[in-house]
Regions:
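ASCE RecA-like P-loop NTPase motor cores
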Residues: 1-138
Length: 138
């Protein structure tokens, strides 16, 4: 349950939240509660959802004019759950390569505040996360 996950995140030491967008909507984990957030997929609304379908029909290009802006907003909210104040630190891992392979990916990249961005292979991901955890990240 979300309550159990919240309890684990606040009681445990170093933590990584890996979940769906519903986990970060309305969640405030300020401070050291959350060290890393892994986003497996860009948070696009489900096109088959009747509400999403109805809203998309209001636009000439529902994907570009509705789905992308909605996903970018959710993406920004996800990042915001990790970094809540000027003193918070964390790693935001995006596993969805569409952020660099699709034309709309730049909209997601521009939605992030100024921060260090690294594009790494999956083989280098865990060593990079370990160096961040150990304080040797450069």
């Amino acid at each position: 349950s979300p309550a159990r996950i919240m309890r684990m995140l606040t009681e445990e030491g170093k933590t990584i939240a890996w979940g769906t967008s519903s986990l970060w909507e309305g969640v405030d984990l300020q401070g050291a509660s959350l060290d890393a957030l892994v986003m497996a997929r860009l948070p696009f609304p489900v096109p088959s959802d009747p509400i999403v379908a109805a809203r998309s029909e209001l636009f000439e290009d529902g994907f570009s004019e509705y789905s992308i802006p909605e996903a970018v907003q959710r993406f920004r909210q996800g990042f915001g759950r990790l970094i809540r104040s000027r003193t918070d630190r964390g790693v935001f891992v995006i596993l969805d390569n569409r952020i660099v392979t699709k034309q709309y990916g730049v909209k997601f990249q521009r939605a992030l505040p100024r921060c260090t961005v690294r594009r790494v292979s999956t083989e280098r991901l865990f060593p990079l996360l370990e160096s961040w955890r150990d304080g040797t990240f450069e």
